[in-house]
């Protein structure tokens, strides 16, 4: 986890690059560097679960901490276990990992019986990797904007880790509506957000912090949605007020996953 002082310096550098329209190339270069370091020090091609390990370059696109193969695997398992603990999983006949990337969480449904496993992502290379190496799952490409390539009420569970955290406010509203469409009545939508834990680490300017504390969504680098550069910070009340139309809010866990994201659990109304 980046310390507040270091984050402040990183934010200043990113802001400077953003003014020059160079922030996205800078982030990509940073990711390439992390991947190269991981590859240089060597790593296996298969994990302890017997499934292939995605290449370091793919993992760093999911998040810089995932250059570490162990963290990639352990955090994915933790999130899968977290999902199981939040919903009545024995009632889930079909689940969708929206924004599955290269299968960080998806891979941990390998041994599940009685549940059809689906995933989708905007990155075609990651989708191809999942379909080749995670044969128990059916993974499809989606665009940055809805719709998803699925029919109405197909899934009992849709979950999204580190997806809403990288979308503009407009896109978030559209995607919540789309997730509601593909859920069965009574189905659950579980997703992560950046909350008070991240704000408390001086991720925001004083003005941005005041806006967050007033209950407003704060989105940094909103012009780069769908990338790790774009970062959205959600007050808990904002989610209940603006993102739960047609849902009941049935669960909330602050700083609950290995990335210290807040976890929200919504249930679709009949």
Language model: regions and residue ranges:
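A short acidic, Gly/Pro-enriched loop at the edge of an enzyme's catalytic core
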Residues: 147-158
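A short SAM/SAH-binding and catalytic strip from SAM-dependent methyltransferases
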Residues: 157-170
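A short glycine-rich, Lys/Arg-flanked "PGG" loop and its adjoining helix->strand segment in the class I
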Residues: 173-185
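Class I (Rossmann-like) S-adenosyl-L-methionine-dependent methyltransferase catalytic domain
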Residues: 2-94, 102-147, 169, 174, ...
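Conserved beta-strand/loop positions that form the S-adenosyl-L-methionine
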Residues: 98
